[in-house]
C-alpha cells in the first residue's frame, strides 16, 4: 500500500558510457543542484493542477478506466490488482495528459498512454509470472488490448 501512494513510476534507464563519464566529471567539482533552474513557479504549478482538474471525463471514459481496473483484479498473473486509489490516479493522470495534448476532455488514448506508468508499481504479480519472466509492462499492455477487443 505504500507504493500505491505514488502517482506514477517512471523508469529512466541507465546513461550510456559517455553520459556516465560526463555525470561523474560534473559531480566531482560542484553540486549539481546548484545548476538547477526553475521552469515553473509555485503559483503556475497550482494553476496547471487546477486546469487539469477541470478537464472533462465522460461516463464512457470512467467506464473504460473501470474495465481496465477490473481486468487487473481478474488477470491470472496478478495477485493484487489496482485499488480505488489507483483508479483515481489513472483518472488524474489521463486528465493531465489531455491537458498537455491541448484538449479539455479525456480520450481513451490518454488513458492508454499513462496506464503502464500509473499502474505497474501498484499491482502484485503471481510468483509464477516472475518465474516465467513476464513483466508488468507486458501485463498492462495485454489488459489494454483485452478491453479494446471486448
Residue ranges and their predicted role:
Residues 72-150:
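C-terminal engagement/docking regions of AAA+ P-loop ATPases
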Residues 16, 40-41, 58, 83, ...:
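Helix N-cap and loop-to-helix transition residues
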Residues 12, 53-57, 127, 131, ...:
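A general boundary/transition motif marking the beginning of the first structured unit of a protein
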Residues 1-53, 59-67:
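Conserved AAA+ ATPase core "coupling" helix
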